[in-house]
């Protein structure tokens, strides 16, 4: 089985294109497995500044077809031209897939380097794929190893020790822009009830903010504030809350964005400045709100440009952990890939031995001599299999496991069966209730 990934991030393309690509991302994995025979597994990682698709296919010969199938699906779901979609994604294969995901999960590839929110997003991406039955066994191992690597980086280095995140940097920027930097006096309206909104609520509380209202176009605000505090808003109470707000923060990414004309009308008699923080990749606020008098607009691009740099020592230590973990994972995966071939060779050889022993017993009976012959033959077979087994491990370590499998098929006619591609959700030990609460 071959792993690959399609990667579109803030580092390579503008965030507007990332946002457009990610439209329909929740449907991609299932659609790809349904419509394509060459994509045997898929996990989608979509965050505020990246859209990545991790896939698995049976062999390297199917790789281009699998990529094309995913590009076609993304084009259909997003409404973007297929050529534009193809150009927007970098394709990773081989060890680069592992190294990239491990770095992403550890926060090394984030707009705010060292931020910890991404580790949870990587974990939730796997859980979602497991629920939908699109996570192949190889992808499950990859994402679980990435999560473990992120934990190791957090435990063994000072990377992220300042607790920086996209939300915290955005709030720091808002503090710098505000005439009054005291959050205890501010009225805040939060749009959204997902994981980002939850992180925003927590950080606002840490800064002393108590007057927080929450709006959800899907009607989830009541349940959200029931466990986190704050005031739930609906369509009727939202305008008054926005009119009185000092800060409004967009975390939902819904289709119901706040238009500049509507905001101007609602705040016509406000008489005080407003800071609008748009953390949604697909924009909760019309970009034109930043042109309104008395309104300062902060976006993900603002956060990226303002993000402080981590210390070189922490980055070096974290990178070493990521590289070591990626190398170990690849070595284990390559060794594992020949296990089925080794088992197939042993089964083939033992079947031949058993067939010959049946002939011996049929001719001579179950005598002591027959038992001695069988014992000698089994010992000889074990010795004969030793070198092919050792060579299999050596070839796998050098990435030549396919050569070994091809040799078995050419010399002995042994067909090596690939392991089952997909891991159904019902067989995966995931906490589905926790997932639902985090994505609400």
Swiss-Prot record:
Keywords: NADP, Oxidoreductase, Porphyrin biosynthesis. The gene is hemA. Coiled coil: none annotated. SUPFAM superfamilies: Glutamyl tRNA-reductase catalytic, N-terminal domain, Glutamyl tRNA-reductase dimerization domain, NAD(P)-binding Rossmann-fold domains. The record marks 100 as: Important for activity. It holds the Pfam family GlutR_N. The keyword DNA repair does not apply. Homodimer. One of its GO terms (molecular function) is NADP binding. This is Glutamyl-tRNA reductase. Its EC number is 1.2.1.70. Substrate binds at residues 47-50, 110, 115-117, 121. It catalyses: (S)-4-amino-5-oxopentanoate + tRNA(Glu) + NADP(+) = L-glutamyl-tRNA(Glu) + NADPH + H(+). Pathway: Porphyrin-containing compound metabolism; protoporphyrin-IX biosynthesis; 5-aminolevulinate from L-glutamyl-tRNA(Glu): step 1/2. GO terms for biological process: protoporphyrinogen IX biosynthetic process from glutamate. Belongs to the glutamyl-tRNA reductase family. During catalysis, the active site Cys acts as a nucleophile attacking the alpha-carbonyl group of tRNA-bound glutamate with the formation of a thioester intermediate between enzyme and glutamate, and the concomitant release of tRNA(Glu). The thioester intermediate is finally reduced by direct hydride transfer from NADPH, to form the product GSA. PROSITE patterns: GLUTR. It is an enzyme of class 1 (oxidoreductase). The active site is at 48 (nucleophile).
């Amino acid at each position: 089985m071959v792993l690959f990934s399609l990667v579109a991030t803030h580092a390579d393309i503008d965030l507007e294109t990332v946002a457009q690509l990610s439209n329909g991302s929740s449907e991609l994995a299932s659609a790809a497995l349904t419509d394509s025979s060459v994509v045997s597994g898929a996990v989608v990682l979509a965050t505020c500044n990246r859209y990545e698709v991790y896939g698995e296919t049976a062999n390297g010969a199917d790789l281009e077809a699998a990529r094309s199938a995913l590009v076609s699906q993304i084009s259909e779901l997003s409404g973007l031209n297929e050529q534009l979609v193809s150009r927007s994604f970098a394709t990773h294969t081989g060890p680069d897939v592992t190294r990239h995901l491990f770095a992403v999960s550890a926060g090394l590839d984030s707009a705010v380097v060292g931020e910890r929110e991404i580790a949870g997003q990587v974990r939730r991406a796997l859980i979602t794929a497991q629920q939908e039955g699109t996570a192949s066994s190889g992808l499950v191992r990859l994402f679980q190893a990435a999560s473990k690597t992120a934990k190791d980086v957090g435990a063994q280095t000072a990377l992220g020790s300042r607790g920086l995140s996209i939300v915290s940097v955005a709030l720091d920027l808002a503090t710098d822009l505000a005439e009054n930097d005291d959050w205890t006096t501010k009225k805040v309206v939060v749009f959204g009830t997902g994981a980002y909104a939850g992180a925003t609520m927590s950080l606002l509380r840490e800064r002393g903010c108590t007057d927080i209202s929450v709006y959800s176009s899907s009607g989830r605000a009541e349940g959200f504030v029931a466990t986190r505090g704050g005031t739930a808003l609906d369509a009727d109470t939202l305008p008054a809350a926005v009119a009185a707000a000092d800060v409004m923060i967009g975390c939902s990414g819904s289709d119901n964005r706040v238009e500049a004309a509507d905001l101007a009308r609602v705040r016509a008699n406000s008489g005080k400045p407003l800071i609008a923080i748009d953390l949604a990749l697909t924009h909760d606020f019309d970009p034109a709100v930043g042109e309104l008098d008395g309104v300062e607009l902060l976006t993900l691009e603002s956060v990226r440009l303002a993000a402080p740099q981590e210390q070189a020592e922490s980055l070096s230590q974290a990178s070493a952990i990521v590289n070591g973990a990626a190398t170990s994972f690849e070595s284990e995966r390559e060794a594992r890939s020949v296990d089925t071939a080794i088992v197939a060779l042993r089964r083939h050889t033992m079947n031949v031995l058993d067939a010959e022993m049946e002939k011996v017993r049929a001719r001579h009976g179950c005598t002591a001599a027959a038992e001695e012959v069988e014992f000698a033959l089994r010992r000889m077979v074990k010795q004969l299999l030793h070198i092919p087994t050792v060579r299999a491990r050596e070839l796998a370590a050098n990435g030549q496991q396919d050569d070994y499998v091809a040799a078995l098929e050419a010399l002995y006619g042994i067909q090596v069966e690939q392991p089952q591609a997909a891991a159904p959700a019902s067989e995966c030990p995931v906490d589905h209730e926790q997932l639902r609460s985090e994505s609400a």
